[in-house]
Each structure stands twice: as structure tokens, then as C-alpha cells.
Amino acid sequence: MVVVRAVQVFDVKSYGGQPNADITQALTKAWTAACAVAGSKVVISAGTYKLGGVTFLGPCKGAIEFNLQGTLEAPSDDASFKGKDFWVSFERIDSLTVSGGGIFDGKGQTAWQKNNCDKESNCKNLPINIRFDFITNSIVRDIQSKDSKFFHINLLGCKSLQIQHVTITAPGNSPNTDGIHVGHSSGITITDANIGTGDDCISIGDGSQDVTINQVTCGPGHGISVGSLGKYPNEQPVSGIRVIGGTLSGTTNGVRIKTWPSSPPGTASDMHFENVIMNNVANPILIDQGYCPNGQCSNKSPSKVKISNVSFKNIRGTSSTKEAVQLICSKSVPCQQVVVADVDLAFKGAGGSATSTCVNVMPTLSGKQNPPACTIKT
């Protein structure tokens, strides 16, 4: 005999939360009550609500769902966050579901003007829309993140987390608004996301293992990136990265791996990109081991992040740059076991056909090679 417990519903309105008002206290009370019950759902029904910076902390007594049907609006002034680097944080929860089709509106327009990270490497981080810290066996689905002040969704220390059918939007010129950043996490699956933003659609940081990205639509943005890696000492290895299917349109990069020069030692391996369509994308296929945005680095020595077991298979479409394929590896630790197969990238601009650059790498080739592989070698 299977006993099915009814899920208890905790509606924010029962705690005094009303549309067009600040529901920070009401929502915190609803979460605290729901977290103390085995099997619960926090509901925010249709409407627009103001919400200050808040942490939803576990562990909870059982599975818990955060069901957002309305729109949550962040304070537009970043000073109201009192130095915190997030707006909404879910922390140390097992069996969490975030769902409902609602919108997390970060109101980032004013904060973007204060972002000086392009000039100052030690810039102050602005608030992330949604943090997931140490979340396990959980699912995030059918939500929207809009106009975050900084990253939209940030994962840290998560295990077995699925992200499905999320929509992420911010203008293409909004700084540091990465769509989803994964760090120090494993068993992460991102499926059917629609991301248009001002930085990487998805970025994968150090300590990430077994991350699968399926059928993501990306653009505007900076593409789908592993890295940047090697900026800090004692970074953890990256491995088991799969990018399968999806379409990138008008992005400043396609699929890329980026590491800093003059880096401490590190490794990135078992990374595979396949069946991806590029529509007028700059740098559709890119390994960049001399990544140095805005001149904020030392070029005294090559990167010491070792890249190995990488494949780019069935990557097709159009490149907005003449150099459609760039495999620029480190002189100190050349890339190993790189496979390029069935690549067909056309360049329609001035200056002739697309080219392919290979530096400190000897890729294994198969299938169609357009542009011809390694037309430029240094």
C-alpha cells in the first residue's frame, strides 16, 4: 500500500502579501512555514509584487515547491541590497521545485550604468537575480528571468539539478548579465532554454562536472562558454561537458573554451559540442587560451590550463567573421585529443571564404571541413 501525502499549500496572500505591494516579509513567513512541513508548496499567484533581497534557506522537512505565477520586481537601486551579491537565493535545499511560469524582474537598467567591470578587474559584483547554492535533486522549470543587474541564474555547489524551459532576457548591451552560470556543480542538465542577454548565454566555471546543455536557443549574447578558467589559483577541474543541439543567432561567439594567460595549472577535459546551428555568429568555434578581456591580464607566460578530449561535431550555419574556426591553444600545454568533424560554416562577408586557425594543436579531422581545417597554422 502506497501512502500519498497531500501537498500543503502556503499562499503568500494568507500571510498578508498583496499585488502592487512589498511582499518580502509575507513571502519569508510563507517559506518558513512551508519548509517546516513534509511536502509543501509556496504559491505566488498572478499579479505584480515588490520583493527585496531574500534568502530561502533549507534544509526543509521534505520536498518543497516554489510556485511563482506572477511577477516579482526587484528594487531598482542596487544600494538597497547593502552589499549582497544576490536578489533571490535558494540555499541548502533537497528536492526543490521552482516553477509556475512567473517572472523574476531584476530591474537592472539603472545598475548597468554603474558596472565598471570592463575597466576595473576587482569591480564590485552587482546582485544576481537568482542564486542556487548547494541545491540537490531538484528542478527549475518554466520560469523567466528578466533584466538582471548581474548574472541571471547562478549555480554553486549543486548536484542533480535540472533546468527546463526557462526564458532569460536582457538587452544585448547589458554588461555581465550571463544567462546561467554553473560553478562547482555536478549532474546539471539545462534543456530547452531560450536565452538572450548581454554576456554568455551559459557559462561553465571551474569545478563543474557532468553538465549537459540540450537544445538551447541563444542570442543576443556571447555564446556558450566553458570558462573563463585559470584566473585564480587552486581552481578545480572541469570535465564531462556536453552541448547538444540548439541554435545561436547573432552572438559574439559560438561555442568556446576560454582560459587566461599566465594562469596557475588546471585541467579541462571531456568536452563535446555537437549538432549546433550558427546563424550569423562571430567566432562560431573557438578555443581561446589567451583570453584577456579589456587588457586585464598579464601575458608574461602562456596559460597552464591543459585542455584535452574535446570534440566539435556537426556544427553548421553562417559565420559573421572570416575566421570561423579558431583553435588557439597554449604553447605551455598544447591541446590534446581535439576532434573536428562535419563542420560547415559559410562566411558571406568581404575578403574571401572562411578560414580555420590552429595554434599549438593537431586536431583529428573527419567528414566535411568548411572552412578547410587549419588553413592558418602558427
Give the ranges of each region predicted by the language model.
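Extracellular/periplasmic carbohydrate-active domains that bind, remodel
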Residues: 1-378
